[in-house]
Amino acid sequence: MMKLRRFLRGSRSSSSHAVGHMTFAKSNVGRTMSRAGSFLKRELWIWPVIAVLILAFVAFWSRRAIETTMKSNLESGLQTLLDVEVAMLETWLSVQASNAESMANSYEIRECIYQLIGEPGETISELKDAAEIQRQLDRDLAPFMASHDYVGYFITDKTKEILAASHSELVGRDDVREYMAFLSRVMEGETVVSPPFESVVGIKVASGELRQQQPTMYVCAPIRNRNFQVVGALALQIRPEREFTRILQLGRFGDSGETYAFGKDGRIVSNSRFDDDLILLGLLPDEEESQSILKLQIRDPLGDMTAGYRPNIRRADLPLTKMAASAVEGNSAVDVNGYRDYRGVEVVGAWTWIPEFEIGVATEVDYSQAFEPLNILQRTFWILFAMLCLCALAIFGFTLIVARLRREAQKAAVEAQQLGQIGRAHV
């Protein structure tokens, strides 16, 4: 019993101490809050400072959140546009391959080609026969080529020697370097659409002249004998500016967005939307009908040429842009943090490499345009922030003036009180 009583007294004592501590803590908190409240009421200048600090924090947090959201949406938009462009391009390239295969497997075409190729160990003995076969091929291919916008053709045997062609100067040649890459793949049984390259024969330009080294490309399909062995190739000539580049031009958006294709050497194989600007920058020759296709390398000039910067080294010695260097390695990526393009302008972009066609495709837009809404928001905030700072300074100055007047009034009151006390003492 005695132990129980001592325990109860101890419990009551502990409870009393706890209550005492809580009361003390509450009183301390209350006094602190009271002093803080009095300070804030007395020192009015502190409110604008607090508002500035809070606004700065909110602005910083909001900008980060908005920038993150914008980058996410921009990344998604660039990737979607690139995917659509690549899908359209791959569909078009597949159609070209299907067209070439269809003609290479045509009975009439195969019969003419078999006569040109001859049986193993034999050659065409009479030029008249070869010329007649050439005319027959021209007649058989003409309707198909016209309906599908092909501008020429050639046929080779298995040794890659050209046996017939719409351009007679090609017949008999087996040393055209530009043709060797895709012909080698065709002899392995592939149907190949070549990237655009400079023509080795004359092509009619807009002025009506025939010019060499104009952009051209070929779709080439294997020709098989009755045992399904590859015995030759049929190549159909395409003008890339008619459909190939037009598909990519559909990927332009805004004032600076563009989609373009390029080869393994970093040369653009479609047109840039900035051809006129590139002439003024000296990146393209100032000539009639000057175009960027096959003339412009995607190299980083190390500075913004549109702002007056000029590199002090040859363009061939400049590195590829970040995008091009990544793509030619076979990589696909999106960059919304910014990198320099072939003009030296900071851009954001998405890119991919299409290995079966040996070309890369990129979609880019100027960084300034992509983040223009964020820049407008940021400028608006800084204007408001500056106005708030001016208000804070004005209130701070007003508070100092009020505080000085208050001190002077208090001093005058004290002096008056002292004078009154002295007067009463004399009385």
Task: Annotate each predicted stretch with a short phrase.
Residues T68-S76, I401-G423:
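Cytosolic signal-transmission helices at domain junctions
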Residues G37-F39, L44-K128, A142-Y150, Q214-V219:
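Juxtamembrane extracytoplasmic/periplasmic/luminal helical "stalk" adjacent to the first N-terminal
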Residues A36-G37, E67-M70, E243-L248, V365-F385:
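Membrane-interface helix-start motif
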Residues A165-S166, I203-S207, R226, R242-T352:
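Intrinsic low-complexity, intrinsically disordered coil/linker regions enriched in small/polar
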Residues M1-V52, K411:
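Positive-inside N-terminal membrane-insertion signal
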Residues A425-V427:
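Conserved small/polar residues in nucleotide/adenosyl-binding loops
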Residues A165-H167, V176, R211-L248, S270, ...:
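Conserved beta-strands of PAS-like sensory domains
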Residues D138-Q237:
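Extracytoplasmic/periplasmic ligand-binding sensor regions of membrane-associated signaling proteins
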